[in-house]
Amino acid sequence: MNVSKIAVFGLGVMGSPMAQNLVKNGYQTVGYNRTLERPSVQEAAKAGVKVVTSIAVAAANADIILTCVGDEKDVQQLILGSGGIAEYAKPQALIIDCSTIGKTAAYELATNLKLQGLRFLDAPVTGGDVGAINGTLTIMVGGDISDFEEALPVLKSIGEKIVHCGPSGSGQAVKLCNQVLCGIHAIAAAEAIQLSEQLGIAPELVIDTCGSGAAGSWALTNLAPKMSEADFAPGFMVKHLLKDLRLVREAAENGPLPGVTLAESLFTSVQLLGGEDQGSQAIIRAYREA
């Protein structure tokens, strides 16, 4: 298929810059978001994304449809619900979901859409808002290899490392492993910042020195400076990380993952402090405001 027209559903912190990068790479890009008032939606429109108010209009002519929304219920409703994407997408359109919804939900979506003459890839992303803006996301893809190969040029417009992980649901499985690391690394960065302040050492010194050695991590480089400055603007929201950690626990069938249990507890404490819509760097609040 010669892909020229793309629809992006969900023009939030991640979806908006992804749509903008598609425009920059020459794709005719239509965008849909439930609420048009969000600044991220306006930014997409200014960058050349044709923002529409109807799921039907957005989906009808798209060769590839990207979805980037909150959780598995949102994805299922958007795609399979009454008046959803599946009702209006053209035959054999390729739907690519970039949300984190878990392996089982992705497999069920793929199976259902195949019965309706549509194709599906689960393609969760990581790299945060910075990666979405810069087009350097890591994308973990599950689904038929032929669909992956067709989607690859499009995915290269929004990501840097794009990996076919296996059949439907495999991208989600790898993403859950990724989220274990993200949650625990954020805690490690927060504890390092907290300790540096208690010891009278500038957090910037710790970030610079430790970040270049074996203790370096994405969280230390990107989240720790925001922790130090109490800059909690999202990025990746606490409520979304908690959702992902729940999916991890469910996938593990509540098996022993004590690090995940700790991460859930600490991020829940931030949520109870009113921080559910703050970025994951707000984990430092669990230490400063406990």
Curated annotation (Swiss-Prot):
Keyword NAD: yes
InterPro entries (alphabetical): 3-OH-isobutyrate_DH-rel_CS, 6-PGluconate_DH-like_C_sf, 6PGD_dom2, 6PGDH_NADP-bd, HIBADH-like_NADP-bd, HIBADH-related, NAD(P)-bd_dom_sf
Pfam families (alphabetical): NAD_binding_11, NAD_binding_2
Domain of life from the UniProt record: Bacteria
EC id: 1.1.-.-
Active site positions, chain numbering: K175
Signal peptide feature range: none
Family, as annotated: Belongs to the HIBADH-related family.
A biological-process GO annotation: organic acid catabolic process
Protein name: Uncharacterized oxidoreductase slr0229
Binding site for NAD(+): 7-21, 100, 243
Keyword NAD: yes
GO molecular function per UniProt: NAD binding; NADP binding; oxidoreductase activity
Entries under SUPFAM superfamilies matching the protein: 6-phosphogluconate dehydrogenase C-terminal domain-like (SSF48179), NAD(P)-binding Rossmann-fold domains (SSF51735)
Keywords assigned by UniProt, alphabetized: NAD, Oxidoreductase
